[in-house]
Amino acid sequence: MLWALALLALGIGPRASAGDHVKDTSFDLFSISNINRKTIGAKQFRGPDPGVPAYRFVRFDYIPPVNTDDLNRIVKLARRKEGFFLTAQLKQDRKSRGTLLVLEGPGTSQRQFEIVSNGPGDTLDLNYWVEGNQHTNFLEDVGLADSQWKNVTVQVASDTYSLYVGCDLIDSVTLEEPFYEQLEVDRSRMYVAKGASRESHFRGLLQNVHLVFADSVEDILSKKGCQHSQGAEVNTISEHTETLHLSPHITTDLVVQGVEKAQEVCTHSCEELSNMMNELSGLHVMVNQLSKNLERVSSDNQFLLELIGGPLKTRNMSACVQEGRIFAENETWVVDSCTTCTCKKFKTVCHQITCSPATCANPSFVEGECCPSCSHSADSDEGWSPWAEWTECSVTCGSGTQQRGRSCDVTSNTCLGPSIQTRTCSLGKCDTRIRQNGGWSHWSPWSSCSVTCGVGNVTRIRLCNSPVPQMGGKNCKGSGRETKPCQRDPCPIDGRWSPWSPWSACTVTCAGGIRERSRVCNSPEPQYGGKDCVGDVTEHQMCNKRSCPIDGCLSNPCFPGAKCNSFPDGSWSCGSCPVGFLGNGTHCEDLDECAVVTDICFSTNKAPRCVNTNPGFHCLPCPPRYKGNQPFGVGLEDARTEKQVCEPENPCKDKTHSCHKNAECIYLGHFSDPMYKCECQIGYAGDGLICGEDSDLDGWPNNNLVCATNATYHCIKDNCPKLPNSGQEDFDKDGIGDACDEDDDNDGVSDEKDNCQLLFNPRQLDYDKDEVGDRCDNCPYVHNPAQIDTDNNGEGDACSVDIDGDDVFNERDNCPYVYNTDQRDTDGDGVGDHCDNCPLMHNPDQIDQDNDLVGDQCDNNEDIDDDGHQNNQDNCPYISNSNQADHDNDGKGDACDSDDDNDGVPDDRDNCRLVFNPDQEDSDGDGRGDICKDDFDNDNVPDIDDVCPENNAITETDFRNFQMVPLDPKGTTQIDPNWVIRHQGKELVQTANSDPGIAVGFDEFGSVDFSGTFYVNTDRDDDYAGFVFGYQSSSRFYVVMWKQVTQTYWEDKPSRAYGYSGVSLKVVNSTTGTGEHLRNALWHTGNTEGQVRTLWHDPKNIGWKDYTAYRWHLIHRPKTGYMRVLVHEGKQVMADSGPIYDQTYAGGRLGLFVFSQEMVYFSDLKYECRDA
């Protein structure tokens, strides 16, 4: 009370603090930014403090900013406390450069300040902007970017910028401007670890990142366990001592008294000594002033001591007395131009102003200013080097420019004037001609027909003169001449005689008779006004004019055509029967050449196509859709030499198809009608008969095409011509596809914010807060953002009492997600046979570590034929048949079954190998049975539309049902791929920046062609995407993967992984299965023992480009090990592996692959079974 009364007597009371009182003085930046383990792109790790998570950021565009309320409080505290302190525990990647803290705004590309750890320069940079001008302070030799944990404290307070690591001061400089007083909140955002560009994002781990507002750095260090040293009480004037401790910024090592020289030659220049003397003069003035101030303090202390009768002890009030004035606790005042003081717990703590190094050689002191200053005239060259020589002229002809430059010695001068000068130069006129490619002129009119009757030709020409190629320009492409047929009236055809028929038998055998022969006017018949044949139709001739002998042969005892031999005694004998007959010469019967020589005519395993005649034979014409000869003859010699050859017609090979010039003719086989189909080439779309440009390679043309009647398939204009969307979904029917429509349902809410993108709901009600609007939520009162509906009844699984719709409630259903009304459970493990991955072995946990759909309990991985099915579950254990096709369901696969349809007709003679038809009916005789005509596997899908015509289990490309296989399923954070299904499973979009994973379909293949369109719809990230084939388990598969840029994987354990840009083809045969070993091996371009082997990598190392459509095509023939990968960019082949041979796996499943890449479109997917 006495001390308070004394103060009141002096007229000094406690002073009210100015400004609003802010309770919180420490802010956890992770907490107020809502950064947690669920934040996309933030991976959680264990740091030095086990109770608090550490984070590594890999997707900086997803880092949330500090919330607005807390940012407002931070800015107010920074102004009130004259700055702030940033504390953190960090482990920065070696030699990396990264931002610790940044305040962006108020504009989209503006910043107010940022703290950047510059590993290459080994500095900690503070950049801030005042009135649009950038200022930079940096602390040197900080040693932060060495991949070691550091506990740092950054001081940005009053006029000081310093760094403490642990309890040690590393470096400190003086701030030029109190920028923290001008910070703005409106339209501003504060981020942790996020830089202004990709190169300035923080690379490493962060923990315990706080903004602290304290009175001094000692308060913060003491809370970290640091011991107080004398440095904490520097510049303190105590009431109990008359000694002033100078700060380390003021050195007293230099003595100006006369001393003996330590060496004969001075190592300092006169200019340096002059600067030193100027600084000492200023220091002398400062020390004298401080000495006088100390004397006044001692006098004032003595006065107060006498006034109050000795030191008082009080707990309620503290104050300081200086030069007769009493100052309240924490009050700050100015002593002189170089000194400020603050009252701290009865002590007066004074701080010296530290001057920045002079920027000129001869600084001067100004009255009232603490620090020396520099002045320059505007036209002075002080500090500049001499001008360099002029550069060469920037052009080789015409008017150009030259430049020269000079440099500034910034260590001691502030140079005025430009550093670069520019002047114009001229080297004569330029040749105005330009390189010009040739162009065709218009076509000339068609010439007259080359004939006056019948079929001829007309011709037209064009010249390469519009313009003529010059200066190395290219010649015109294409032909300068074009010809087409012309039709005139048919020409007259004069009739001509056929050959004479054989002479008829003579009317008598001797003494003269008559024989005749005839001819017909049909070779050709007269047509179109032609002349008739001239001459007689019949001709007669005398025969057997000789006298009649007495001869036994005169009575013609032999078979006509057989030679008769007579003898003098009147007897006779007959020679052999004529060709085409069998007998003794007297009696001859027709020889059936068709029965003796069975392969005369082409056979289709049906009725004989050879017709026996009397005499001779002939073959029926070739069956429909075959072409060949039609032989005929008499006798065995003709039968053995004249064979009928019928070959299947192939319009693609014969060039008789009607496909467009930019389409490919695909031969379907002679059993199909039609025998071919037309598909537009890559870069084009249409029905094959008409093809147009297709920029995004999704199978739809840029413009409408005039296709054949009722043939609108892929002839309609693409509703998203620059973004692949093979399904062409357009919910609001506005002509803009959903893929590129910003508001699919036209409810005035953009798709990005719409919680029902495909349903009009402007009110956006969402009762269960699952980000799916009530109008389209299949469980509107139950949180279920995935919207899974197993039985497709409109009620989501999350709120359905019977998920699979088998009339068995979930709590009693042993297969709640698989329809099984019988609830059969052979092994009694509580899991129904329909969904049990070991139906004959008790395994209630259903663990399947290798993701091959066989539970670990019964998985032995013994597979002698490498087709992905272990021996005890393989229906052909010794013959590779990945598809396990068994069309007669007899337990024996078609690959090892001699009668696939069990109709009693062996496969090699069965005209419908997969369909039961013991009668083998074949109406048109083409070798294909009627029952499987145009649908070989009898799956009700015509072969021309069937992607697997010989497998009734696969009819179309469909990835709507797939198995999600995470390849690195463990870790502190796990981001799985997010697959969006479109176009009935023919288009999938992966939206997340995820860990490696596969979406693998359930259809299984041996020989297969697999193609699709690849498109990355973002400019964020640059990592892997591709597809898999021959998938047998998560340890055994082939993968084609494509990286945009070369990059080392950020986790170097368990093995360092270097990923090179370009397309790679790899075979995975992992001994460890999914996890970090397989993850790093997949990233690595090369071989990793026991994990991955690279079969091919594109030597051009071409990475994919953002917003660019590519088309891949895979060919795989497991029987020979042949595989080939082609990648098109537009119409051109960008990468081609050529023939690659590997027989590690004999087939498997197909799927899509991603590794740390978001917004990947897999569009217009297509797989087709092929003959081995």
Swiss-Prot record:
The record places domain TSP C-terminal at 960-1172
Q: What does this protein do?
A: Adhesive glycoprotein that mediates cell-to-cell and cell-to-matrix interactions. Ligand for CD36 mediating antiangiogenic properties.
Q: Where is this region: Heparin-binding?
A: 19-232
Domain Laminin G-like residues, every copy = 19-215
The similarity comment for this entry is: Belongs to the thrombospondin family.
Q: Which organism is it from?
A: Mus musculus
Report the residue ranges that make up the EGF-like domain in this protein.
549-589, 648-692
What UniProt keywords are attached to this protein's entry?
Answer: Calcium, Cell adhesion, Disulfide bond, EGF-like domain, Glycoprotein, Heparin-binding, Repeat, Signal
Enumerate the InterPro entries for this protein.
ConA-like_dom_sf, EGF-like_Ca-bd_dom, EGF-like_dom, EGF_dom, Thrombospondin_3-like_rpt, Thrombospondin_3_rpt, Thrombospondin_C, TSP1_rpt
Protein name, as recorded = Thrombospondin-2
Which ranges does the UniProt record give for the TSP type-3 repeats?
693-728, 729-764, 765-787, 788-823, 824-846, 847-884, 885-920, 921-956
Tell me the leader sequence span. 1-18
